């Protein structure tokens, strides 16, 4: 199972330096949506990481699809704090790691 990252050049470079091989730059909304669809179709990807700002600019229908996805589990990181990551991990592995 691999981790994929989609985002701006800074995020892609950072995750690439951390050893993530599937790190894709997407600047426009169209590039972002196309790359997300490509990664979602890849059976080797178990986790997809996006920046919260990129996630927020996606169409609501795609946001819903990503939010409900178990494989890959989609994690939006950035400035917003939420319990969503806890719920996604619980849904993906069946265990609440915070208990």
Swiss-Prot record:
It holds the Pfam family ATP-synt_F. One of its GO terms (cellular component) is plasma membrane. Its main location: membrane. InterPro entries: ATPase_V1-cplx_f_g_su, ATPase_V1-cplx_fsu_bac/arc, ATPase_V1_fsu_sf. One of its GO terms (biological process) is proton motive force-driven plasma membrane ATP synthesis. It is a peripheral membrane protein. It is found in: Cell membrane. The keyword Transport applies. Component of the A-type ATP synthase that produces ATP from ADP in the presence of a proton gradient across the membrane. HAMAP family: ATP_synth_F_arch. This is A-type ATP synthase subunit F.
């Amino acid at each position: 199972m691999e981790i994929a990252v989609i985002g701006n050049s800074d995020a892609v470079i950072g995750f690439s330096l951390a050893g993530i091989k599937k790190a894709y730059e997407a600047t426009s909304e169209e590039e972002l949506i196309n790359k997300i669809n490509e990664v979602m179709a890849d059976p080797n990807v178990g986790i997809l990481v996006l920046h919260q700002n990129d996630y927020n600019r996606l169409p609501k229908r795609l946001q819903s699809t990503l939010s409900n996805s178990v494989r890959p589990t989609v994690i939006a990181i950035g400035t917003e704090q939420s319990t969503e990551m806890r719920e996604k991990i619980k849904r993906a592995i069946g265990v609440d790691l915070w208990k």
